[in-house]
Protein backbone atom coordinates (compact mmCIF):
# COMPACT_ATOMS: atom_id res chain seq x y z
CA UNK A 1 0.00 0.00 0.00
CA UNK A 2 1.58 3.27 -1.03
CA UNK A 3 2.09 5.90 1.65
CA UNK A 4 1.67 9.65 1.41
CA UNK A 5 5.02 9.95 -0.38
CA UNK A 6 4.53 7.42 -3.09
CA UNK A 7 6.74 7.25 -6.13
CA UNK A 8 3.78 7.65 -8.44
CA UNK A 9 4.01 10.98 -10.24
CA UNK A 10 1.46 13.72 -9.73
CA UNK A 11 0.68 13.86 -13.46
CA UNK A 12 -0.48 10.25 -13.45
CA UNK A 13 -3.45 11.12 -11.23
CA UNK A 14 -4.63 14.02 -13.37
CA UNK A 15 -6.44 12.14 -16.19
CA UNK A 16 -8.79 10.59 -13.66
CA UNK A 17 -9.88 13.83 -11.98
CA UNK A 18 -13.04 15.74 -12.76
CA UNK A 19 -11.08 18.85 -13.70
CA UNK A 20 -9.05 16.95 -16.28
CA UNK A 21 -12.15 15.46 -17.88
CA UNK A 22 -13.77 18.92 -17.90
CA UNK A 23 -10.70 20.45 -19.57
CA UNK A 24 -10.69 17.74 -22.23
CA UNK A 25 -14.40 18.23 -22.95
CA UNK A 26 -13.94 22.02 -22.92
CA UNK A 27 -11.52 21.73 -25.82
CA UNK A 28 -14.14 19.82 -27.82
CA UNK A 29 -17.22 21.91 -26.85
CA UNK A 30 -16.08 25.35 -25.62
CA UNK A 31 -19.41 27.17 -26.02
CA UNK A 32 -21.47 24.45 -24.40
CA UNK A 33 -19.28 24.14 -21.32
CA UNK A 34 -18.07 27.73 -20.89
CA UNK A 35 -20.01 30.23 -23.00
CA UNK A 36 -23.51 28.96 -22.32
CA UNK A 37 -23.17 28.85 -18.50
CA UNK A 38 -21.56 32.30 -18.57
CA UNK A 39 -24.37 33.81 -20.64
CA UNK A 40 -26.99 32.05 -18.50
CA UNK A 41 -25.43 33.57 -15.39
CA UNK A 42 -25.54 37.05 -16.93
CA UNK A 43 -29.20 36.71 -17.98
CA UNK A 44 -30.26 35.21 -14.63
CA UNK A 45 -28.43 37.98 -12.78
CA UNK A 46 -30.25 40.57 -14.85
CA UNK A 47 -33.62 39.09 -13.92
CA UNK A 48 -32.61 38.82 -10.26
CA UNK A 49 -31.47 42.46 -10.08
CA UNK A 50 -34.54 43.93 -11.81
CA UNK A 51 -36.57 44.30 -8.56
CA UNK A 52 -33.62 45.97 -6.86
CA UNK A 53 -33.27 48.58 -9.60
CA UNK A 54 -37.04 49.13 -9.63
CA UNK A 55 -36.93 49.76 -5.89
CA UNK A 56 -34.15 52.29 -6.41
CA UNK A 57 -36.15 54.28 -8.94
CA UNK A 58 -39.36 54.07 -6.90
CA UNK A 59 -37.53 55.55 -3.92
CA UNK A 60 -36.15 58.32 -6.15
CA UNK A 61 -39.65 59.06 -7.50
CA UNK A 62 -41.10 59.23 -3.99
CA UNK A 63 -38.43 61.73 -3.00
CA UNK A 64 -38.85 63.92 -6.09
CA UNK A 65 -42.57 64.14 -6.66
CA UNK A 66 -43.89 66.41 -9.33
CA UNK A 67 -45.86 69.24 -7.78
CA UNK A 68 -48.22 71.68 -9.38
CA UNK A 69 -47.40 75.33 -9.80
CA UNK A 70 -49.84 76.28 -7.02
CA UNK A 71 -48.17 73.93 -4.55
CA UNK A 72 -44.76 75.29 -5.49
CA UNK A 73 -45.92 78.80 -4.76
CA UNK A 74 -47.45 77.71 -1.47
CA UNK A 75 -51.00 78.51 -2.53
CA UNK A 76 -53.83 76.30 -1.43
CA UNK A 77 -57.56 76.92 -1.14
CA UNK A 78 -57.03 80.29 0.60
CA UNK A 79 -56.59 82.12 -2.70
CA UNK A 80 -58.60 85.25 -3.21
CA UNK A 81 -60.57 85.81 -6.37
CA UNK A 82 -58.87 88.22 -8.75
CA UNK A 83 -60.89 90.71 -10.72
CA UNK A 84 -59.03 92.69 -13.38
CA UNK A 85 -61.03 95.88 -12.79
CA UNK A 86 -60.46 95.79 -9.05
CA UNK A 87 -56.74 95.23 -9.55
CA UNK A 88 -56.57 98.09 -12.02
CA UNK A 89 -58.25 100.51 -9.61
CA UNK A 90 -56.10 99.30 -6.73
CA UNK A 91 -52.93 100.05 -8.70
CA UNK A 92 -54.31 103.43 -9.78
CA UNK A 93 -54.83 104.36 -6.13
CA UNK A 94 -51.16 103.82 -5.28
CA UNK A 95 -48.87 106.82 -5.28
CA UNK A 96 -46.07 105.75 -7.61
CA UNK A 97 -44.38 109.16 -7.75
CA UNK A 98 -43.36 109.29 -4.09
CA UNK A 99 -40.27 107.09 -3.85
CA UNK A 100 -36.67 107.39 -2.76
CA UNK A 101 -33.64 105.73 -4.34
CA UNK A 102 -31.47 103.78 -1.88
CA UNK A 103 -28.14 102.09 -2.43
CA UNK A 104 -27.88 98.41 -1.69
CA UNK A 105 -25.52 97.47 1.14
CA UNK A 106 -22.48 95.65 -0.21
CA UNK A 107 -20.52 92.89 1.48
CA UNK A 108 -17.07 93.82 2.81
CA UNK A 109 -14.54 93.76 -0.01
CA UNK A 110 -17.20 93.67 -2.72
CA UNK A 111 -16.91 96.45 -5.33
CA UNK A 112 -19.81 98.87 -5.08
CA UNK A 113 -19.75 99.93 -8.72
CA UNK A 114 -18.69 103.55 -8.16
CA UNK A 115 -15.69 105.05 -9.91
CA UNK A 116 -13.73 106.98 -7.30
UniProtKB/Swiss-Prot annotation:
Question: What membrane topology is given?
Answer: Single-pass membrane protein
The UniProt keywords, alphabetically, are: Membrane, Mitochondrion, Mitochondrion inner membrane, Transit peptide, Transmembrane, Transmembrane helix
GO biological process: one example: mitochondrial cytochrome c oxidase assembly
- Please state the span of the N-terminal signal peptide per the UniProt entry: none
Transit peptide, start-end? 1-10
What is the first-listed, main subcellular location in coarse terms? Answer: mitochondrion
- Tell me where it resides: Mitochondrion inner membrane
Which function does this protein serve? Answer: Required for the assembly of the mitochondrial respiratory chain complex IV (CIV), also known as cytochrome c oxidase. May participate in merging the COX1 and COX2 assembly lines.
Describe the family membership recorded for this protein in Swiss-Prot or TrEMBL. Answer: Belongs to the COX16 family.
What is this protein called in UniProt? Cytochrome c oxidase assembly protein COX16, mitochondrial
Organism of derivation: Phaeosphaeria nodorum (strain SN15 / ATCC MYA-4574 / FGSC 10173) (Glume blotch fungus)
Amino acid sequence: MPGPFSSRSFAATLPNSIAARYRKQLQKHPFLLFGLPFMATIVAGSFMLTPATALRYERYDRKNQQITQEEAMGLRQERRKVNMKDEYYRLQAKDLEDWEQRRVKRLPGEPDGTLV
